[in-house]
């Protein structure tokens, strides 16, 4: 509502070259009708691409881009997800978690985490892990995301060192 509604957000993100996603409704709409949650979606790859654009293009004033990066680095939620395997490393992670309500089948509609990792060697990667319609517990979903994060971290640290 602050930028003109879902259609304005959708159009702007498409103007950046991101295509495999949809923003049709607001967060409030989704909380009022859980089945509507499926109207807003993105592939993990497109979400990671959008984050990469945010990190590398001048979309806003520098101070606002730095603010967004720092807010992600300071994120306190979901430390058992993407950040978990990085906690005892020198890597810096910025991330944003997402969690949904349960659907009519009692499944978590979505458990997500998207972020960027700054490695000690100066390289960076972006990552997005989305779990949809999960019958697993929140703890198990977090472990799944953490294990994927660990595989990616090992790939980058072992491939580039």
Predicted regions and their residues:
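Structured C-terminal helix/loop/strand segments within mature extracytoplasmic catalytic/sensor domains
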Residues: 2-3, 49-81, 85-91, 100-161
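Carbohydrate-binding/catalytic loop surfaces
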Residues: 30-39, 90-102
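Mid-domain, small-residue-enriched loop/turn segments at the edges of structured enzyme/sensor domains
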Residues: 1-59
């Amino acid at each position: 509502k602050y930028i003109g509604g879902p259609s304005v957000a959708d159009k702007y993100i498409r103007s950046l070259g991101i295509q495999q996603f949809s923003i049709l409704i607001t967060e409030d709409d989704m909380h009022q009708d859980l089945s509507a949650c499926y109207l807003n979606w993105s592939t993990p790859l497109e979400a990671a691409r959008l984050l990469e654009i945010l990190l590398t293009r001048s979309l806003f004033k520098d101070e606002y881009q730095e603010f967004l990066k720092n807010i992600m680095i300071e994120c306190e939620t979901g430390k058992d997800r993407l950040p978990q395997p990085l906690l005892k490393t020198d890597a810096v992670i910025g991330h944003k978690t997402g969690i949904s309500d349960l659907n009519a089948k009692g499944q978590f509609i979505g458990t997500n985490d998207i972020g960027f990792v700054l490695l000690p060697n100066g390289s960076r990667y972006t990552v997005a892990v989305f779990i949809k319609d999960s019958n697993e517990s929140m703890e198990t979903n977090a472990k799944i995301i953490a294990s994927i994060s660990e595989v990616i971290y090992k790939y980058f640290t072992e491939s580039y060192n």
